[in-house]
Design a protein with these regions (language model features):
Chain A
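A hydrophobic, multi-pass inner-membrane permease signature
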Residues: 1-293
Length: 293, 298, 566
C-alpha cells in the first residue's frame, strides 16, 4: 500500500462525509414512520410526531398482528416470493444465455431478442390482460400472481449484457473439453456472474413483494390478497365526500395513522432485511481467470 | 444446415419456456390494442364496440392543453432520467472508492430504503418539510439567509421539486445495477493499471468507466422508453390546482378522464401513443449504437 | 431510476388511470327534483305501515320463503372497515343467515374486492360477459347494461313483492325520486342506491371558545363570519381565519357555503328563470364569491399554503389550534373534531354548528345534490328477479323498521359494523334527521321510551357528553343532540325549505364523458388563481366564455334533453 497523497485524503474525507449525509437523509422518513407507529393515535393524527414516538405504546402492533387478514396476506406474499422468484430467475438465465451469443453462433438470436423486447414496449391494456388470464382459468388461483410475469424482460436484457462480459476464451475452452451448453451455463456463467444474478434476484424479489394491482384485480377473495394488495386497501385516501354517520364513526379507526405506519413498517421489514444478505455478492470482485470450466 | 440446427438446438430449447410465457401473457393480450380504435364499452365487448378509427388519438392531440401536458411530461421525465442516471452512477462510483466494507454496506442499505415507501406516505412528509412557513427546509434556507420558495405550490419550482424528490427516493435502488457492474470488473485490470503507474483518477478513467460502459449504455437506451412516463403516483399525490400549468402530465390527464367514465379506449390509445414513441427512440438508439460503436445493446 | 420498473409501472399506471373511483358517482349525481323543495324528508318516518301507493297487480307476501332454497350469485366491494365476529365472514354472518332462514335465499359472492377497485373489477367482469345474478353498478354502467339489454325488468317483481316500507322509500321519500331514477321507458330496471339530500349541504363549524374570547356575538350574517375570521387570525398566533382545502369543493373546509352566501351554487345544475338547467359555477354570483375569497386571501384570512393542503392536512391544522372556522358537512364532529377534542378539550375547545349565512338581506340557501350512488340490477334471464326485491324488503325490516334488531343487524356494543354486510343495503333517506329530532326531544323530556335501538345509542352519547362531560361522546352528541348539526342546521334547512338541490342525477351525458375533465380542470385552476391573486377577478369572465366554448354549451344542451325526457 502506498502512502495516500493529500489530494486523495481530502477526496476520501469528502466522500465519507457526503455519503454519510446522503444515507442520513434516506433514513429519516423511515424513522418518521417508525416513530409514528409507536405513538398514540391522537398525536399521529395531529402530525406532531417527528423522529421520536409521542406517548409511546405498542397498540398498533398488537392490533395489526392480531388481524387475520394481515397474517393471511403475509403468507400469500411469502409463498409468492418463494415460488415466483426462482421461476423469474431461472427463466431469465435460460433466455439470457442463448441471447448473449454472437449472431454467428445463434442465428435466431436477433429475432428472439426483439420478440422479448417488444413486450416491454407494448401492452394491450387491462381488459384483454384480464380476459387472457381468465380464459386460462387462473383467476383467483395462486398462479395468477406468478405466471403472467414469469419472464422479467428487463432482467433478461441486463443479464444478457453481463453474460457478454465473460471472456469468450473460457467458453471456447469448455466446448473443446466437451462441455454442453447446459453445463457451461451452470458451471461457468452462473458463478462468474454472481453480482448480476444477485441483482436480478433482488429485482424479482422486490417486484413480487411490492406488486399490489394484480392481486386486487385477479383475486376473487380478499383472503387471497398478497400483502401489498391488502395494504393498498388501508393506505388509500378516504373520500370525504361520500360519508354517512356510520362510516364517519369508523373513519377515525381506519384513518388511524399509527396502524398504517406499523403495517407499512412490518410489510417493508423483511424486504429491507434481505438486502444485506444479497449484498455480499455486490461487494467482492470476481477473478475471471480463476474459474475452471 | 441440419448440423447447424442441431448445434443451435440447446439454445432454442433454453429460450422456449420463456418464449411460451411471453407469447401467452404478453402477445395474446396485445391483440387488445384494437380498442384504441374503438369507443370501447365494457358491456359491448371488443367485437361489438363501435369502431372510431383514430378518433381517440385525435381527441388527445386536440385537447386545448395538449401541448402543455406533453411538454410537462417530457420535461419532468427527461429531467428525472438524466438526474437519476447521474445520481445513481455517481453514487456507485463514490461508494466504490471507499475502503471500509462495513461502512459501504451500511450506506448502501440505508440509501436503498426510501424505495420501499410509497408516494402516498412520502407525499404528506414532503408537504411538511417543504412548507415555506414552518418546514425544516425553509428553516435551513433561512439560516443561510435565503427566502424559501413555495416548492410544491409554485409553478416554477414544482417540476424541480418532483425531480429532486424522485431522484432522492430512487437513486439508491438504481445504483444496484452499477454496483453489480463495478463488481464484475476483473481486478487484474486494476493490477495491470497500477503496474503501469496509473493513479486513482486514471484507474477510474481507464478501467472503471470502460468496465461499466456497456451497462450504462444499456440503461440509457432502456430509459429512453420512459420519456413519456413522468411518474404517475408521485405527480398525482403532489399535484394541486395552482401548479397545473407545469405539473399536469399525460397520465394524470388520463386519470381525470377516467373519473367521468371508464375511458378504456382512450387510455389504450394513449398507451399505444407512448409505446410508439418509446419504440422509435429505443430502436434509433439501438441502431446508432451498433452503427457508430459497433455495439449491440440487446 | 425510472426504467427498472417499466413493466410494473405500466400496470400501475393502467390501474390508476383506469380506476374509476366512486368519487365521481357522488360528484356527478346531481339531481332532478322538478318540484324543488325539501324532498319530503320530514314526512318520512321509519314505520313500515304507511299505505301502499302501488297499483300492484297481484300482491304477494313480501317475505315469502323459497322452498327449496334458491341460490343467487353476486359480487361485493369490501372495506378496511369490515370487522367480523369470531368465525364469521362476508359469507357467514347474521345477514346471510337471515336471508337463508327467512327467505330461503343463499347468497353466493362470486368475487369480492376492495371498494377502491370495485368499479374497475366490475368493468372487467362486464367486459368478460360473466355477469353475476345480482350486482351493484354505477349510473354509467347502468346505462351501458341497459343499452346492451343485459339486465332484467323488475317492474312485475316490484309490484308483486315490494314491502310497504320499500315502496315508501322508493315512491314517497325524496319526492319519489328513487323509483323515478331507476325507471326507464316506464320499466323499473333496478333498485336505486341513494344517500340523503339534506346531508349533502354545507354547515358552518365554529370554535365557540374562541368566539367567547373574542367577545363577539354568534354570527347572523356572512359579514359576522368575516369579522370572526379576522378576530381568530388576530387573537391566535399561527391561526388562519378560515380553513380551505386545495380541492375547494367537497369534503372538509370548502367554498360551497361561502358561495351560498352570495346565492351562488357552484358544481350543481339548477333551473334558471326560463326553466332551463344551467351550471352553477359559471353564473355571475360566482364572480362575487371569488372576489370575496380573493380579498380574504389578501387579508391573510386564508392559509397562504392552502393550495397544497388536502382534508387530512386541514384535520391536522384543526387539531393543532390553527383553524377555528370551516364550512363542511354535518358529520365532521365524528372526524376530525372528535380527535381535536380528545386532544384540546382540557384547554377549553368547543365547537358549534350554524346554518350557512347570507351576505345580503336574502336568506342563504345551502346547495346539495340528489345522491344516486348506483343501482342494484338483476342479470337478464335470472329465474327469480323478485329475489332482489325480497332481499331489500328483509334488509329494511331487520335494520330500520320498528321491528329492527340493531344489536344483531346494525352495530353491536363492540362496534362490529353489521350494517355493512347486507347484499342489498338501503336506508330511509332521512333516517339521521329523524334520529336527531327524536333524540333531542327525548333528552329534553328525559324519556327515551320512544327511541329505537339505534337512536337509544345516540341518546346515551348525548347524555354522557352533556350531563357527564364525557369527551369521547362529543362526536355523536354534536350531531344528534340539542345544538347538534341535525337539529340546529339540517332540520332548519328542510323545514324552511331552503335547500337548492342540483337537478341532474343521470349517467354522464356523452359530451361530459369527453370534456368534463377538461372543464373541471379549467374551473379549479381559474378559481384557485383568482383566490391567490395570480389572476385578476375579471379572469372569471373569460373563464365563463371558455367554459361555454370548450364543451359547456353542448353539455348544457344534452342535460336539458335528458331533463326533458324525464
Amino acid at each position: 500500500m502506498t502512502r495516500l497523497s493529500f489530494g486523495r485524503k481530502f477526496f476520501l474525507t469528502f466522500d465519507y462525509i457526503l455519503l454519510s449525509i446522503l444515507a442520513f437523509l434516506c433514513l429519516l422518513p423511515l424513522v418518521n414512520v417508525l416513530a409514528i407507529s409507536f405513538s398514540s393515535s391522537t398525536a399521529a393524527t395531529a402530525n406532531i410526531v417527528k423522529f421520536w414516538p409521542v406517548d409511546f405504546n405498542l397498540k398498533s402492533y398488537t392490533y395489526a398482528l392480531s388481524k387475520p387478514e394481515f397474517s393471511d396476506a403475509y403468507w400469500v406474499t411469502i409463498k409468492r416470493v418463494l415460488i415466483g422468484t426462482p421461476i423469474n430467475v431461472i427463466l431469465t438465465m435460460l433466455v439470457a444465455y442463448p441471447l448473449s451469443k454472437d449472431d454467428r453462433l445463434f442465428r435466431w438470436r436477433k429475432y428472439y431478442s426483439w420478440v422479448f423486447i417488444f413486450t416491454m414496449l407494448f401492452n394491450g391494456g387491462l381488459i384483454p390482460w384480464y380476459m387472457t388470464i381468465k380464459t386460462l382459468g387462473l383467476i383467483d388461483t395462486f398462479w395468477a400472481l406468478v405466471l403472467p410475469g414469469a419472464v422479467p424482460v428487463f432482467s433478461v436484457i441486463l443479464l444478457l449484457n453481463f453474460f457478454r462480459g465473460i471472456p469468450k476464451e473460457i467458453e471456447e475452452a469448455a466446448l473443446i473439453d466437451g462441455c454442453t451448453h447446459w453445463r457451461i451455463l451452470w458451471r461457468i456463467f452462473l458463478p462468474l456472474s454472481a453480482p448480476a444474478i444477485a441483482t436480478i434476484t433482488l429485482f424479482a424479489l422486490v417486484g413480487h413483494w411490492n406488486s399490489w394491482f394484480d392481486g386486487l384485480i385477479l383475486m376473487n377473495k380478499t383472503e387471497h390478497y398478497p400483502l401489498q394488495s391488502y395494504l393498498q386497501t388501508l393506505v388509500i385516501s378516504f373520500d370525504l365526500k361520500i360519508m354517512n354517520v356510520k362510516e364517519a364513526e369508523l373513519l377515525s379507526q381506519i384513518n388511524n395513522r399509527t396502524l398504517k405506519a406499523s403495517q407499512i413498517f412490518l410489510a417493508a421489514l423483511p424486504i429491507m432485511l434481505t438486502y444485506p444478505f444479497l449484498q455480499k455478492y455486490f461487494m467482492k470482485g470476481i477473478v475471471m481467470g480463476s474459474v475452471k470450466g | 444446415m441440419k448440423g447447424l440446427f442441431r448445434r443451435e438446438l440447446p439454445f432454442h430449447i433454453m429460450v422456449w419456456p420463456g418464449l411460451l410465457a411471453v407469447l401467452i401473457f404478453s402477445y395474446v393480450p396485445m391483440a387488445g390494442v384494437v380498442i384504441a380504435f374503438q369507443k370501447f364499452i365494457p358491456a359491448k365487448g371488443v367485437f361489438d364496440s363501435q369502431w372510431i378509427g383514430f378518433d381517440n388519438f385525435r381527441f388527445l392531440f386536440q385537447q386545448p392543453d395538449f401541448t402543455q401536458i406533453l411538454r410537462n411530461t417530457l420535461v419532468i421525465a427527461i429531467a428525472k432520467i438524466v438526474a437519476g442516471l447521474i445520481a445513481s452512477i455517481g453514487f456507485a462510483l463514490l461508494l466504490n472508492e471507499l475502503g471500509k466494507a462495513f461502512f459501504k454496506r451500511t450506506i448502501q442499505t440505508l440509501v436503498y430504503l426510501p424505495h420501499f415507501l410509497s408516494w402516498i406516505i412520502l407525499g404528506g412528509v414532503l408537504i411538511d418539510i417543504l412548507s415555506p412557513s414552518e418546514g425544516i427546509v425553509s428553516w435551513a434556507l433561512g439560516f443561510l439567509g435565503i427566502n424559501s420558495p413555495f416548492f410544491l405550490g409554485s409553478s416554477s419550482w414544482f417540476p424541480f421539486t418532483l425531480v429532486l424528490s424522485d431522484v432522492w427516493k430512487e437513486f439508491g435502488f438504481g445504483a444496484i445495477v452499477y454496483l453489480a457492474a463495478l463488481t464484475s470488473i476483473d481486478p487484474t485490470h486494476y493490477e495491470a493499471a497500477v503496474i503501469d503507474g496509473a493513479n486513482r483518477w486514471r484507474q477510474t478513467w481507464h478501467v472503471t468507466l470502460p468496465g461499466i460502459a456497456p451497462i450504462v449504455v444499456l440503461m440509457v437506451t432502456l430509459s429512453l422508453g420512459n420519456v413519456l412516463n413522468a411518474g404517475f403516483d408521485q405527480v398525482f399525490i403532489l399535484l394541486s390546482p395552482s401548479v397545473m400549468d407545469t405539473g399536469d402530465i399525460i397520465d394524470t390527464w388520463v386519470y381525470r378522464m377516467g373519473l367521468v367514465n371508464a375511458q378504456y379506449g382512450l387510455a389504450t390509445a394513449v398507451g399505444l401513443f407512448k409505446s410508439v414513441i418509446s419504440s422509435i427512440l429505443i430502436i434509433t438508439s439501438f441502431v446508432m449504437a451498433s452503427k457508430f460503436a459497433n455495439y449491440r445493446v440487446f | 431510476m425510472t426504467n427498472i420498473f417499466a413493466k410494473n409501472r405500466m400496470i400501475t399506471f393502467a390501474s390508476l388511470a383506469l380506476s374509476i373511483s366512486l368519487v365521481f358517482v357522488s360528484a356527478c349525481s346531481n339531481g332532478n327534483n322538478s318540484t324543488s323543495g325539501n324532498g319530503g324528508a320530514l314526512k318520512a318516518s321509519s314505520s313500515a305501515d304507511s299505505p301502499s301507493s302501488s297499483p300492484a297487480s297481484v300482491e304477494a307476501n313480501p317475505f315469502e320463503k323459497y322452498e327449496p332454497a334458491i341460490e343467487i350469485t353476486t359480487v361485493r366491494s369490501t372495506s378496511a372497515r369490515f370487522k367480523f365476529l369470531d368465525g364469521e365472514s362476508l359469507d357467514n354472518n347474521a345477514w346471510t343467515r337471515a336471508y337463508e332462514n327467512e327467505l330461503g335465499i343463499k347468497v353466493k359472492n362470486v368475487w369480492t374486492t376492495d371498494e377502491a377497485q370495485y368499479q374497475n373489477k366490475m368493468n372487467v367482469t362486464i367486459a368478460s360477459g360473466d355477469l353475476p345474478d345480482l350486482m351493484f353498478v354505477s349510473p354509467a354502467q347502468f346505462q351501458q347494461l341497459l343499452e346492451s339489454d343485459q339486465i332484467e325488468d323488475l317492474t312485475t317483481a316490484y309490484d308483486q313483492y315490494a314491502s310497504p316500507f320499500l315502496r315508501k322509500i322508493m315512491e314517497q321519500d325524496a319526492n319519489g325520486l328513487m323509483k323515478k331514477a331507476a325507471t326507464v321507458d316506464g320499466k323499473m330496471m333496478g333498485i336505486t342506491g341513494f344517500g340523503s339530500i339534506e346531508q349533502g349541504t354545507p354547515v358552518i363549524w365554529l370554535r365557540t371558545d374562541w368566539l367567547e374570547q373574542a367577545d363577539l356575538p354568534e354570527p347572523t350574517s356572512f359579514d359576522d363570519i368575516l369579522n370572526i375570521a379576522e378576530a381568530f387570525k388576530k387573537n391566535h398566533s399561527g391561526a388562519y381565519g378560515i380553513g380551505l382545502n386545495k380541492d375547494l369543493f367537497g369534503g372538509l373546509a370548502t367554498i360551497e357555503g361561502i358561495a351560498n352566501a352570495y346565492h351562488a351554487y357552484p358544481k350543481i345544475w339548477l333551473k334558471d328563470d326560463s326553466g332551463k338547467l344551467v351550471y352553477g359555477s359559471v353564473q355571475p354570483e360566482m364572480k362575487q364569491t371569488l372576489a370575496t375569497l380573493q380579498d380574504m386571501y389578501k387579508r391573510g384570512l386564508i392559509d397562504k399554503e392552502f393550495g397544497v393542503k388536502d382534508g387530512n392536512k386541514i384535520a391536522e391544522d384543526i387539531m393543532n389550534n390553527k383553524i377555528g372556522l370551516i364550512y363542511a358537512n354535518f358529520w365532521h364532529p365524528l372526524w376530525p373534531l372528535q380527535e381535536a377534542m380528545n386532544m384540546n378539550s382540557a384547554d377549553g375547545m368547543t365547537w358549534k354548528p350554524y346554518p350557512v349565512l347570507s351576505a345580503d338581506d336574502q336568506v342563504a340557501s345551502p346547495s346539495t345534490t340528489i345522491p344516486v350512488t348506483g343501482y342494484y340490477v338483476i342479470k337478464k334471464g335470472y329465474k327469480h328477479p323478485e329475489a332482489a326485491i325480497k332481499l331489500a324488503n328483509l334488509q329494511l325490516k331487520n335494520a330500520w323498521s320498528d321491528e329492527a334488531q340493531a344489536e344483531l343487524y346494525n352495530t353491536d356494543k363492540d362496534q362490529t359494523p353489521f350494517y355493512l354486510y347486507p347484499t342489498i343495503s338501503m336506508e330511509p333517506p332521512s333516517k339521521n334527521l329523524e334520529a336527531g329530532i327524536a333524540v333531542t326531544e327525548a333528552y329534553q323530556a328525559k324519556d327515551f321510551s320512544k327511541l329505537n335501538e339505534e337512536q337509544k345509542g345516540y341518546y346515551d352519547n348525548v347524555l354522557a357528553y352533556l350531563d357527564n362531560n364525557d369527551i369521547k361522546s362529543f362526536g355523536n352528541a354534536l350531531i344528534f343532540g340539542p345544538g347538534g348539526s341535525e337539529m340546529e342546521v339540517l332540520k332548519k334547512y328542510v323545514e324552511e325549505n331552503r335547500m337548492k338541490i342540483g337537478e341532474f342525477y343521470g349517467a354522464p351525458v356523452p359530451t361530459q364523458q369527453m370534456k368534463q375533465a377538461t372543464l373541471d380542470k379549467l374551473e379549479l385552476e381559474t378559481f384557485t388563481k383568482i383566490i391567490v391573486g395570480e389572476s385578476p377577478i375579471d379572469e372569471f369572465d373569460s373563464f365563463v366564455e371558455k367554459w361555454h366554448k370548450l364543451g359547456g354549451d353542448e353539455i348544457t344542451n344534452e342535460i336539458n334533453e335528458w331533463n326533458a325526457a324525464q
